[in-house]
A protein has these predicted regions:
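Core dinuclear metal-dependent hydrolase active-site scaffold
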Residues: 1-56, 127-213, 285-298
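Active-site environment of divalent metal-dependent phosphoester hydrolases
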Residues: 14, 36-37, 66-72, 96-100, ...
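Active-site metal-binding motif and surrounding structural segment of the metallo-beta-lactamase
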Residues: 37-92, 201-222, 237-244
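Short regulatory "switch" loops immediately downstream of catalytic or recognition motifs
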Residues: 77-79, 94-101, 154-156, 196-200, ...
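Stable alpha-helical elements in mature extracytoplasmic
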Residues: 39-43, 73, 111, 115-119, ...
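Charged helix-capping and loop-helix junction motifs
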Residues: 166, 197-199, 227-234, 261
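Binuclear metal-ion centers of metallo-dependent hydrolases, dominated by the metallo-beta-lactamase
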Residues: 84-91, 95-148, 159-165, 240-298
Length: 298
């Protein structure tokens, strides 16, 4: 296998998980999901099946933010498979010691803090790995892929975040053949709007945003208030994806108002205008970046 692939990994327990195989055989992983018990073995088996017997080498593991549905599986995975995998780098920006004053505090999301701590302990099991806190504007080249950081946690300063979604990083990955993959994580309305606001220091011109593959923001619920609906639709129009990854269950994708209700005009735009296909995360979807073929795996 001499070409790169990008896959949305099936999750039984919810969350978000992506695996990118570089043309030379190493991997870039993004987040991971909620439950190791349900999904960790599947991820390991998938990676092994794509190594051609060379062993699993993770060139970089990217993390968007610290909610448990993005870091819990990774924390256990790194612990259980310590002797079976090699991790060369972790790219993240997960603030610690923040008193979240909004949703996270209201619902008592102590579990998120627990799994954040487990994650920090797990990454330190790999002393040979480079642990790097990303900042907006940084660019990394890993194998044949360029990773740009478009948003990071500090961009909210001086306003305190009210929940972990407001610290989510946004990454753009560009493959050697020009295919681009936009990873919005759980970034929501006000932060995503800055990417299309000419008055913002975070503004990205239209050509910089265009990507063939899009990870739909926050599992299909990109904003918390109507005032940003227009900005999110503008963002999605400028990204202009051919393929959308929706990190959400099939049932939610087909039935939940988050994805289908007409009030979420930005989701309607994606469902009606995406030139190829929309994919939920109840099955693994793998894209060959050379010929753009799509493979569905159980």
């Amino acid at each position: 296998m001499s070409h790169s692939t990008v896959a949305q990994i099936k999750l039984k327990s919810g969350g978000m998980s992506y695996a990118i195989r570089l043309s030379e055989g190493r991997f870039i992983l993004i987040d991971g999901g909620t439950s190791f018990e349900a999904d960790g073995a599947y991820l390991y088996e998938y990676l092994c099946s794509r190594t051609e017997g060379e062993g699993v080498v993770i060139a970089a593991w990217l993390f968007t933010h610290g909610h448990l549905d993005h870091v819990a599986l990774a924390a256990r995975f790194m612990t259980v498979y310590r002797e079976s995998i090699r991790i060369e780098r972790s790219l993240y920006n997960i603030p610690v010691g923040i008193d979240f004053c909004g949703y996270d505090a209201k619902v008592g999301n102590d579990r998120d803090a627990i799994f954040e701590r487990e994650w920090f302990e797990a990454v330190r099991l790999y002393p040979e790995a480079d642990l790097h806190e990303v900042r907006t504007g940084e660019v990394f080249r890993i194998g044949d892929i360029v990773i740009e950081v478009l948003l990071s946690a500090e961009d909210r300063y001086p306003d305190p975040p009210t929940n972990r979604n407001e610290t989510s990083a946004v990454f753009k990955l560009t493959f050697e053949n020009g295919v681009r993959f936009m990873v919005l994580g759980d970034a929501m309305g006000a932060r995503l709007a800055k990417l299309v606001d000419p008055a913002s220091s975070l503004f990205c011109h239209e050509g910089r945003l265009q990507c063939e593959i899009l990870q739909v923001a926050h599992h299909g619920l990109a904003v918390a208030s109507y005032e940003y609906f227009g900005a999110i639709e503008t963002l999605y129009r400028r990204i202009s994806p051919r393929i959308c990854f929706w990190p959400t269950y099939a049932h939610r994708f087909y039935n939940d108002p988050w994805c289908q209700d007409e009030k979420y005009i930005y989701n309607r735009f994606l469902l009606c205008s995406v030139r190829e296909r929309n994919f939920h995360s109840s099955q693994t979807v793998e894209i060959n970046t050379e010929d753009r073929t799509v493979t569905l795996l159980e």
